[in-house]
Amino acid sequence: MSAPTPLAEASQIPTIPALSPLTAKQSKGNFFSSNPISSFVVDTYKQLHSHRQSLELVNPGTVENLNKEVSRDVFLSQYFFTGLRADLNKAFSMNPAFQTSHTFSIGSQALPKYAFSALFANDNLFAQGNIDNDLSVSGRLNYGWDKKNISKVNLQISDGQPTMCQLEQDYQASDFSVNVKTLNPSFSEKGEFTGVAVASFLQSVTPQLALGLETLYSRTDGSAPGDAGVSYLTRYVSKKQDWIFSGQLQANGALIASLWRKVAQNVEAGIETTLQAGMVPITDPLMGTPIGIQPTVEGSTTIGAKYEYRQSVYRGTLDSNGKVACFLERKVLPTLSVLFCGEIDHFKNDTKIGCGLQFETAGNQELLMLQQGLDADGNPLQALPQL
């Protein structure tokens, strides 16, 4: 055992391996910059950060938009309606954007007979509110603290239904994204959480490939234990960005895979396959009592295409359940569009049809001239802006 070093010779003690001696700049800094251990941690982080930047990674987007090219852009589930519909939209300004909308519908089980909505948006704030003839109120508010942090609030109040409140926080870094949200959160006197909490993380590992996971915790009753699950996510974008693949392995055993393809300049195609694993109880044919369980796998596939032209947009889908659907949006005038959608279920011998009109009006002279394809001086525009 070596003898202890006298205090007078403390300066002769060698430095710890892998720790560089303090520089003159570090010795004049604060505790974290002058401390050798914290300095080593900071140097290691800088090296890792420099290596990540050399990989040329990009932001992978959010988990919510993992397969938006297929589910939102190509497929028509976001646009389909039944019955007759008329939309009257009026834009008052472009920056900041302020717009109101009146929606009338007849013969639809999903849409209310009348709904009014207002929208306001600028560089940092987005606010939208809706109210219908049944006095059901809904609204959402997005506020960007900076380019990376966005806070979101969704609220829905309906007669005869429980109130829904969702709080959400988005963080978009250069090569990853984090999202945390909670639905109807509440805490008891004992500090027990009830509601739904979801946290997701998506990280780019190469310029084309991103991997992530999503965790969910749900507890509706304070006396019962909560449920938790983890879903695994992946997204791959080709170098030319002409096709995108995304996959999800959800906590309930569902496997979802989708593929988006840019066929031509104005043609897009997408396919999505869902496999659901489950358990079916087996009962005794004579007694009717359960005697076991049997694993089952159910699946469905949907194929869709989108044709976008200068004055019209066409979407069509075909799935393995025998449903064929289409949606057509035709701009007859700069301020008038005609909507048509239809669906045929061959297995159930059922059909659905929807027709609608969409009017765009301007709240001032400048916007009116823009809708007519003219600038402030009355000269034709090269491209008609989208209001």
Curated annotation (Swiss-Prot):
Span of the signal peptide: none
Compartment list: Mitochondrion outer membrane
Q: What cellular component terms from Gene Ontology apply here?
A: cytosol; mitochondrial intermembrane space; mitochondrial outer membrane; mitochondrial outer membrane translocase complex; mitochondrion; pore complex
According to its record, how does it sit in the membrane?
Multi-pass membrane protein
What's one Pfam family here?
Porin_3
Please give the CDD domains that the UniProt record associates with this protein. Answer: Porin3_Tom40
Q: Which GO terms describe its molecular function?
A: porin activity; protein transmembrane transporter activity
Q: Spell out the InterPro entries in the cross-references.
A: Porin_dom_sf, Porin_Euk/Tom40, Tom40, Tom40_fungi
Q: List the disulfide bonds.
A: none
Keywords assigned by UniProt, alphabetized:
Ion transport, Membrane, Mitochondrion, Mitochondrion outer membrane, Porin, Protein transport, Transmembrane, Transmembrane beta strand, Transport
Biological process (GO) annotations? Answer: monoatomic ion transport; protein import into mitochondrial matrix; protein insertion into mitochondrial outer membrane
Functionally, this protein is described as follows: Channel-forming protein essential for import of protein precursors into mitochondria.
Q: PANTHER family, from UniProt?
A: MITOCHONDRIAL IMPORT RECEPTOR SUBUNIT TOM40 (PTHR10802)
The UniProt family comment states: Belongs to the Tom40 family.
Q: What does the subunit section of this Swiss-Prot or TrEMBL entry state?
A: Forms part of the preprotein translocase complex of the outer mitochondrial membrane (TOM complex) which consists of at least 7 different proteins (TOM5, TOM6, TOM7, TOM20, TOM22, TOM40 and TOM70). Interacts with mitochondrial targeting sequences. Interacts with FCJ1.
The entry's protein name is Mitochondrial import receptor subunit TOM40
**Source organism of the structure:** Saccharomyces cerevisiae (strain ATCC 204508 / S288c)
The gene behind this protein is TOM40
